[in-house]
Amino acid sequence: MILCICEKPSVARDIGAVIGATTQRQGYLEGNGYWVTWTYGHFCTLKEPADYYPQWQQWSLVYLPMMPERFGIKLLSDRGIEQQFGVIKSLVSQATEVINCGDAGQEGELIQRWVLQMAECRVPVKRLWLLESLNNRLVGHRGEPQPLHRHTALRHL
């Protein structure tokens, strides 16, 4: 199955209607060889200093600068986000391909890439570049989904 991940439920419904994924499931739509799921804004954030080292919980000049070897991300602590992320992670683990249908631009790209990283995505990812989705008719669609490497520059914020 091909998994489409949208940035919001309304876009998922619009895309689902276009590609024939109209059967409602818990946290996603299904049909015609596709799963269409969604986030709702930011699901992930950068880790806090204490997430790296417990001694960084309290700010002290002794520990400055606080520079981890590698910056990490974590899922936001929210029951709804955790539940929907569980759906996404399960679908990612079963998908043969993922299509990033996040909002156009750097922020939309970052939201989707962090979710895919947290979900440990190991299948090919493509990017569907949408400027707007309206009334089950995709507007501003620039062709077929493209390999993700064509949009690599967007991840450099």
Name each model feature, range by range.
Residues 1-157:
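Intrinsically disordered, low-complexity regulatory segments
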